[in-house]
Amino acid sequence: MGNLTSAQPAGCKIVETLPATLPLALPAGSMLTYDCFDTLISQTQSELCIASYCCNLRSTPEGGHVLLRLLELARANVRVTIIVDEQSRDADATQLAGVPNLRYLKMDVGELPGGKPGSLLSSFWVSDKRRFYLGSASLTGGSISTIKSLGVYSECAPLARDLRRRFRDYERLCARRCLRCLSLSTRFHLRRRCGDAFFSDAPESLIGSTRTFDADAVLAHVQAARSTIDMELLSLVPLVRDEDSVKYWPRMHDALVRAALERNVRLRLLVGLWHRSDVFSLAAVKGLHELGVGHADISVRVFAIPGAKGDAINNTKLLVVDDEYVHVSNADIDGTHYARHAFVSFNCAERTFARALGALFERDWQSSFSSPLPRALPPEPATLLSVN
C-alpha cells in the first residue's frame, strides 16, 4: 500500500481473558487480562490513564483486587485518571470518590458535532506514555474473569504517546470544551506506521486531518485481501440506527461479498452467540453463509460459552487478513458503532504477530464451543416442460 514505517518495533503481546468454563490454551508468550492490568499498575510511576465504557470492578473478586491496586497507586502519589461513558452506572464511584490523585470523569459522546447520542466504547490503558493495553476488556470484573476478551499489550513508547493523545482529547470532551480545542493529532496512521502498527478511530468527528477512520482502515485491508479473511466478533450489522430512523450501511458487507465472489478469498466469520444477539446481525451473517456455494468459500460459525449467565460472552473483536494484517478493537462491524460511538482500534501488519492472532482465531474456530450454521436446503431441480 505504499506505507512509510518508522523503525521502532511495536513489540506486541496478545492479552486474553479465558473464562474457567472455556478450557482453551493461552497462546505462547501471551498474558491474561488480569495479569496485564496488574503489570501496568505495578510499572506505572507517574501517570495511569484508563478509558472504558464503565467502571464496575467489584463484580468479581479479581476485579475487586484490580480496584484496590488502583486505589493504592493513587494514594502512592501517582496520577490515575479514569474516563467512562456519561450513561454508564457509577458502580464503583463511591470507592473512587475523594481519593487523592484519582480523577473519575464522564464523557458525553453526544457533545460531538451533530449532537447524535452515542457511547464511549474505547477500552485502553496508557502507563507513563511508555506502555499500553488496548482491546475488548472494559474496566469490569467480568472482563477480567468471566467474559472472553482479546487485547494487545505493548511497550512501544511512540505508540503509547500516540494513544495518550486520544485520551487527552477525551479529557477535554469531559470538560465540555469545544471541538476546536481538540488537537485530533497523530503521528501514525494508515500510510505512516510505527513498527507496522497504528491506531484508527471513530466516529469521524474525532478524526481530524491525520487520523484514520476505523472503517477506512478495515476496508482498505479487506479490499486488498488476496487469500483469506477471518473475523471473530459479536455482531455484524449493516445498519446505522438513529432514534427515529434506520439506514442501510452496505460498505463492509459488500466488501466482504466482493472479496469472496470476485477474488476467490476465503471468508470465515465466527460470531458470538448470547441472549442479546442482534437479530439483524444474525440475519446478515446467515445471508453471507448462504452465499457460500459454488466457488464462493464463505462459512459462518457461532461461538457459545457453555452455561453462560448474564454477560458471559465471547467478546473477542478480531480481524485477520492473509495472516499479514490484524485489527483488534472493542467495537463490532456495525454501522451505528462507526457513526455514533467513540473508540480506538489497534492495527498491525507485523507478520509474526499477525500469524499468532491467526492461530488464535483457528483455535477458536476449531474448538468444541464453535458450531456451524446450518445451510438452507437446496431447491428441488426445476421440472423441464417441453413446448410442443
UniProtKB/Swiss-Prot annotation:
Signal peptide (residue range): none
Domain PLD phosphodiesterase per the UniProt entry, residue ranges: 310-337
Recorded topology in the membrane: Lipid-anchor
Cellular component aspect of the GO annotation: host cell endoplasmic reticulum membrane; membrane; viral envelope; virion membrane
Gene3D superfamilies membership: Endonuclease Chain A (3.30.870.10)
Gene Ontology MF terms in the entry: catalytic activity
SUPFAM superfamilies membership: Phospholipase D/nuclease
Covalent lipid adducts (N-myristoyl glycine), residues: G2
PANTHER family (alphabetical): GM01519P-RELATED, PHOSPHOLIPASE D - RELATED
Function: Envelope protein associated with the inner side of the enveloped virion (EV) membrane.
Entry protein name: Envelope protein F13 homolog
Species this chain originates from: Molluscum contagiosum virus subtype 2 (MOCV)
Gene name linked to the record: P43K
